[in-house]
Amino acid sequence: ETLRQELVGELALECLLGNSTPLYARLYGQGLINSGFYYGYESYPGVAFLVAGGESKDPGAVRQAVWDEAARIGREGIDGGLWQRVKKGVYGGKVRSLNSFDTLCVGQAQAFFAGFRFLDFARLFDTITKAEAEDMIARWTVRERTALSVICPKEQ
């Protein structure tokens, strides 16, 4: 179950914030994010969260845009073509990462301590549905469950 949720989280984030999404293109085009924008899914015993970060001239506008897009996905769903592209891309990235001895070792160790088998991602991946990713986005990316931290340069 932990591995499944991690995979759903990764796919959900790629569909919401990935660099091939309309939201990313809009935010980048408006200069609200730059190429240093990042996002990820983290989980630990008893807690899991989605995170996004980077430099922005208006972090509040980025947060609002993410809320708005998450709400839209909750109402309308993820575009089917985007879902297929993201799913293939994420799977390909996971398979490519197996070429890295470090990634393989760290992944297996983390999975062992989390109670699952690292290489089971291949078996589970095809069973993950668009509806699961849509549900995660709709439930997790709401005002009551988000926080914004802004770090400003020290005045000189």
Model regions and ranges:
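His/Glu-based metal-binding/catalytic segments typifying zinc-dependent metallopeptidases
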Residues: 1-22, 26
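Histidine kinase transmitter module recognition
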Residues: 15, 93-97, 140
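Residue-level signal for short amphipathic helical patches enriched in basic/charged
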Residues: 15-19, 128, 143
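M16 family metallopeptidases and their MPP-like homologs
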Residues: 24-75, 80-128, 145-152
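Generic solvent-exposed, charged/amphipathic alpha-helical segments
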Residues: 9-13, 24, 67, 130, ...
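Proteolytic maturation boundary segments
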Residues: 130, 135-156
